[in-house]
Design a protein with these regions (language model features):
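Short glycine/serine- and small hydrophobic-enriched flexible loop segments
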Residues: 41-45, 100
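His/Asp/Glu-enriched, well-ordered alpha-helical/loop segment
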Residues: 39, 60-62
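Short loop->beta-strand "edge-of-pocket" segments that line small-molecule binding or catalytic clefts
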Residues: 5, 27-30, 63-64, 68, ...
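Alpha-helix capping/helix-boundary segments
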Residues: 11-12, 35, 74, 94-95, ...
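Active-site neighborhoods of divalent-metal-dependent phosphate/nucleic-acid chemistry enzymes
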Residues: 67-109
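Acidic, PIN/NYN-like endoribonuclease modules and their adjacent C-terminal/linker elements
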Residues: 2, 32, 96-124
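Residues that scaffold the ATP/ADP-binding catalytic core of kinase and kinase-like folds
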Residues: 14-16, 42, 116-117
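Short, well-structured N-terminal submotif of metal-dependent ribonuclease cores
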Residues: 1-35, 46-55
Length: 124
């Protein structure tokens, strides 16, 4: 059985090959539904003016996730831990909290999150 890894949007994009880097192999990838919007925003900015490419790349990115979790149960803790200045990193903070809750590693492309409870893996 493969090991499980929680991913934020950057982790999902790296696994899908949209971002460069080394990715976990033989793993089950878990993510929050919240990450879908962050992934969409990134891909739309990357392929502005090309809806077909946006559609395909979002589909490819989302297909690497094996299980999606709802973010609603983590909103309060995310906002509390992330602070007011973490607007662009809220997805990463939510994923970190999910990873800590499940006692699994986090795969992220963010430098803004850290934990003394779980392993954090990055694509670089």
């Amino acid at each position: 059985m493969p090991s499980s890894v929680v991913c934020d949007a950057g982790g999902v994009l790296a696994i899908a090959g949209v971002l460069e880097g080394t990715v976990p192999v033989d793993a089950e990838f878990l993510a929050l539904d919240w990450s879908t919007m962050t992934i969409g925003r990134f891909v739309a900015a990357r392929h502005e003016g090309s809806p077909e490419r946006i559609h395909v790349e979002i589909g490819l990115a989302l297909s690497v996730v094996h299980e999606w979790f709802p973010v609603r149960t983590l909103v309060t803790e995310t906002l509390s831990r992330a602070g007011q200045g973490a607007v662009d990193a809220l997805d990463s903070w939510s994923a970190l909290i999910l990873a800590e809750t499940l006692d699994l590693p986090l795969f992220t492309a963010s430098d803004e999150v850290s934990s003394d409870r779980i392993e954090i893996r990055r694509p670089w």
